[in-house]
């Protein structure tokens, strides 16, 4: 069963995502800030990370940069989620994230993108 790490400081938003993405048949782990996200990613090695940009303690851009330098997480698909706009999108691509979704999220499109990325990872693992 694929594992998705959801990183956001809004617990209601995390619950909504878990509910709406339940049909994907994935296990979810959560982190409420950047430091927790790094710890969870290193220990549990999720198959995909949904990462908010505005987080307490360590922002999502910094988390992504650190994860991309770690051998165990450098190829893990990362999807940024944020209410921030296009300038952030450009920086996201430069940081090697796999995608960027503006809040409020288009959940159908997000589900499709998650499925694509997990399928890609499965094929690359073979």
PLM regions: where:
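Alpha4 helix (beta4-alpha4-beta5 surface) of REC/receiver domains from two-component response regulators
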Residues: 18, 62, 84-102, 112
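Acidic catalytic/metal-coordinating carboxylates
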Residues: 33-36, 59-62
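Charged docking surfaces used in two-component/phosphorelay signaling
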Residues: 15-23
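Active-site beta3 strand of CheY-like receiver
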Residues: 44-50, 55
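The C-terminal output helix
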Residues: 115-126
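The feature encodes the CheY-like receiver
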Residues: 14, 56, 86
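Short hydrophobic/Thr-rich beta-strand motif most characteristic of the beta2 strand and flanking loop
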Residues: 25-32, 40
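Active-site residues of response regulator receiver
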Residues: 8, 52, 82
